[in-house]
């Protein structure tokens, strides 16, 4: 026996789970070999992974046939099995690096982000390699602030923390730095002209372009000066005075030789050479001017220089020792001079300075190294090196530690505070950092950095998710829930819900990151060859191929050790490829087909949307044994029949026919029979006879799209017809909304005997006569039928001689003979009103009357006297004929007499009432017969009546012109009043509109009065009056005037169309009319889509509502008011009869009602008669409201009980258990949706510009519980109104005892209350639509329920749609089934959590029983969309809307679908738990007395034998219902 699915669970798959599903890894992007057309090895269609392409045949063909089943071919590695395994065997792609599942990233709010407390933007920055996320800060500090775990870092920040902060400042060529190499700089300090440091640190020169060596020069030189001028000292510092000359002094040579002159900037040295040898060195201090030049030969005593004033030592020179010899009046000084002599060397880019700034060098030491030894710079003497004009300055955040001896660290080492750096422990680091040993500068630099663990991409997120301690996080968040801030609590709640979802489901957060991507079975993403040798392939193959290519490329790059930036880019591309496979286009631009704009369909696209798996393939499938064709009318058919084209029937019933042909020996076997049918010309007459036999007793289903309600599919008994069109009974057209202007219908054959029986009993057209929405007949006479029946039941009224009085009948007859009185003119004879016809024609029985008509003595419409069923009637032969027709159809003329109103013509409504009364009194079968009779005679009579339309039938009343002239006069008065300033423009406009509205109404009345008095048999009038075609508005436009037209904006043109169509429109009138026509067309198109969508939302919210039990036992009820407040007079008046009927009919009384001496007991189902009785009682002032059970108060979970629902309106009897009342309600509300107007009226008067939403948009607004645009201000408390007027505002105070509430309103607000009025909470103070959410807060759920039902009904009633309240109540109940927790008490619930009222109430019962604090909650009002998405069934919600969001939420919570509603069962292909699929019907055995007795005996025996095993299924009596 097939196992029955009871629940369906959805959860996250772990990487191990994904691998366990897989039959092998897909390693190559290849699909199939284009030459052999066989799948490539390790590719996306590999037979080794996914199974063989042909049944029981391996790839190489070594093993064929079923006997090798299960064997794996040793040659090709393919398992021998059925090829169907290629529909469910999966593969996988092992990712080179983890990738996040986009559903959990991009869902709102992001699931991964919620758990890790990251915003969606932050999470994306990490996943797509824009920022690092810190996994372990390891004491890192950024800009003086400690780095925290999960902090995001930019590339720059990460490099700074990991490798230290450094900045390079390039310098223009030839510009020297303002700081020295190795100098400490601060932020804002100028490093070079125009170059400012942006950070603190150590400045290091990069590539100095110039080196200056300050060579240390020493020289012993002589100087003779006047003794009197000498300033005597042992040594001289730079710039000190040697002598103070009072008069010029010539210094003369003491040796002869060639002069060599050396300039010392502030002095000179003179060398005298004899050949190569220097014979004398003379020092000329500052203040002495040389008198000789380079190369000059001097003799002893020749003046060398002249001194004047002060003689000083140059400022860059010192004289360390001075030897003085006094010779007469002069002194001979020998000075030991020391000075620095700078020398610049250019450094080319290919040369390298190998000494640091300030280094001391000895002669012969290398300063600048170069490849070419010629270019090297060698020190000429002892000196100090200075670096200049660096190409750039590097500022590094580091500590510099000079060392003398051994370095104990190497470059790249990481050190912490206290770690030894050099000199045997003397030099230690004071910070965290990375070591740079600088042997050129003899320092150890510790660049401030940290061994921080921060990463990018999904692997970083996976690591964080793995580390999460959910229990600890739950405790922390529960603490956070106690925070006073509401925003903080709300955020904590959202996080807590996700945390608990993971904890309760057993899912692990890190499973949201994929390590392996599952590959769909190949037959679910096929590749097929199309004409021309090309291949058509599923988009998924392209997406998988892209993913495999990127994955393989990344593996290769990782193996090759590619640079970090390339790896990072490749990882990002891999993440994007995984995203595209799962949900293409969710982030960034979608992947498209090369050369086209069409995005590729990813896994998500395959699931969601109208074309997705759920809606296209699971909730709606194309079925076998079906066909479609154009429909034509079949007036000869019975109500339960349809005409099925022979060829179509042959195909539809082929299997049955083949069997029959074999049985009757038309063919030896099925194969031959099939061949015979395929050759069309071989079909013999006996085959058609066999087909007749096959279809005998069978029904087919006919469906017309759009199927807006359940009557869009009905069962019919097929009748074989020639031709190719399906013939449809005219009376079912209304249910299908079909006409014969080219409509098509589909035919389906129910195959099993169960299906046939169900279709015949429950879906047969003759069994679906009443509308499930209102309980009124749907199969009812219309169009021609009404026309024919109205024609014969109309009576002729004539004017000639009307009102004449006669003493005796003979006198009257004599006057008729003389032509003074017409046959049907009302006259008075002996004080009694009568007519000549009644006196002249007196028949003993109906047959005589009808014979007289046949002989042409009378018309059907003449009033005569007939004896009928023992009564003397004054009526027309036509009415007698009608009574006859009905009597014959129902088989009882007496009953017919009771059903028919003989004294009125039979128009649309009276015929509808006739059908309904017949249904109630005579049942379905006889009603169907009656309908067929009415159809037959209606068509016949409308044909013989000869009613046609000619142009002269549009008769224009004479009064029209008078009314128009009167209107023009009033119009001039209005214009004058406006011009004189008595009216505002708006008031003028309103009055003009009002004037023309009244005028049009007068013209309409004149048209009909004219018809009634002068042309009672006018075809137009007859059609409109009978309800056959046309309405007063259309007749008005034909014969009266078109009246006011609408602008596209919805406002009204103040210029009316005065002409009628009979007269013809002027150009301007035609132009004005065209606006409205176009708007009508646009509205209809929009309306159809909106209406269909609304129906879908309603079905989704209500489909689980099924009648589940007989009585829920509730004591709650609703009171249906019989009176309502009149909008204009503000007084109570009785509601319209039809409104009361749609509120009360078919309901169960919740309390006893006594009125007019009659008692209606509690628990009674209210029939239409009962409702009419209650209306009478209300008129007599004995009843104001009626207490009834309602779905709103029903206590049955996931449904309603029989008592709270009441009648099944389509059967006019109590609803059966298992009836899918939720879907019926949704269809009943949605089906008339297209009829509702789109208009949003612009209201006149003060509040200009405020739109009052009406029609379909208003219905949608109410069902979606939206806050209305033009909102009414409502009172939040009971109290007395006090109004204060300010300069620009109104203040309305509602005052109750010790409390007052103020409402500030604009000055032009339209108030509904006066000073001193008493108002209740929830009562509107101003005009406008009430916000249902505010009403819920002010007055509670009951008030909102009532408001929503009333407001929705208002819209439907305005369009003349009759709809029972209980359908709306079922949907409204679903809108109010959720509550919000305000205080969790002792439960695990959270403040602000939303859940079903049932669950909270059940939990509270448990808590109270355990003596704990119960949960406090407040009711919530949800729109149908939100309510449908909040349902417990994840299958139902996902197949409705927001598929990815629903599945994401369900997966993390590991949700179980209990399969309670209809949709989820349809999706799984189970019988729906409603109707014949409900357990109540399926497990109910129908038994007779004998079987009951046998069961009783068996039970006794069982008890005696004390068998422990209980009977598996309870045996119950079948309850009355529609179940099989």
Swiss-Prot record:
Residue positions binding Zn(2+) 1: 58, 60, 73, 76
Record-level Gene Ontology MF annotations: DNA binding; DNA-directed RNA polymerase activity; magnesium ion binding; zinc ion binding
E.C. number: 2.7.7.6
Species in which this protein is naturally found: Thermus aquaticus
Quaternary structure, from the entry: The RNAP catalytic core consists of 2 alpha, 1 beta, 1 beta' and 1 omega subunit. When a sigma factor is associated with the core the holoenzyme is formed, which can initiate transcription.
InterPro entries: DNA-dir_RpoC_beta_prime (IPR045867), DNA-dir_RpoC_beta_prime_bact (IPR012754), RNA_pol_asu (IPR000722), RNA_pol_N (IPR006592), RNA_pol_Rpb1_1 (IPR007080), RNA_pol_Rpb1_3 (IPR007066), RNA_pol_Rpb1_3_sf (IPR042102), RNA_pol_Rpb1_4 (IPR007083)
Protein name (Swiss-Prot/TrEMBL): DNA-directed RNA polymerase subunit beta'
Listed Pfam families: RNA_pol_Rpb1_1, RNA_pol_Rpb1_2, RNA_pol_Rpb1_3, RNA_pol_Rpb1_4, RNA_pol_Rpb1_5, RPOC_hybrid
Record key words, sorted: DNA-directed RNA polymerase, Magnesium, Metal-binding, Nucleotidyltransferase, Transcription, Transferase, Zinc
Family: Belongs to the RNA polymerase beta' chain family.
UniProt keyword Magnesium present: yes
Region (Disordered): 1502-1524
GO cellular component terms attached to this protein's record: DNA-directed RNA polymerase complex
Binding-site list for Zn(2+) 2: 1112, 1194, 1201, 1204
CDD domains cross-referenced by the UniProt entry: RNAP_beta'_C (cd02655), RNAP_beta'_N (cd01609)
Keyword Transcription attributed: yes
Cofactor field: Mg(2+); Zn(2+)
Highest taxon listed in the record's lineage: Bacteria
UniProt binding sites for Mg(2+): 739, 741, 743
Catalytic activity of the protein: RNA(n) + a ribonucleoside 5'-triphosphate = RNA(n+1) + diphosphate
Spans through the membrane: none
GO biological process: DNA-templated transcription
Cofactor note: Binds 1 Mg(2+) ion per subunit.
Function: DNA-dependent RNA polymerase catalyzes the transcription of DNA into RNA using the four ribonucleoside triphosphates as substrates.
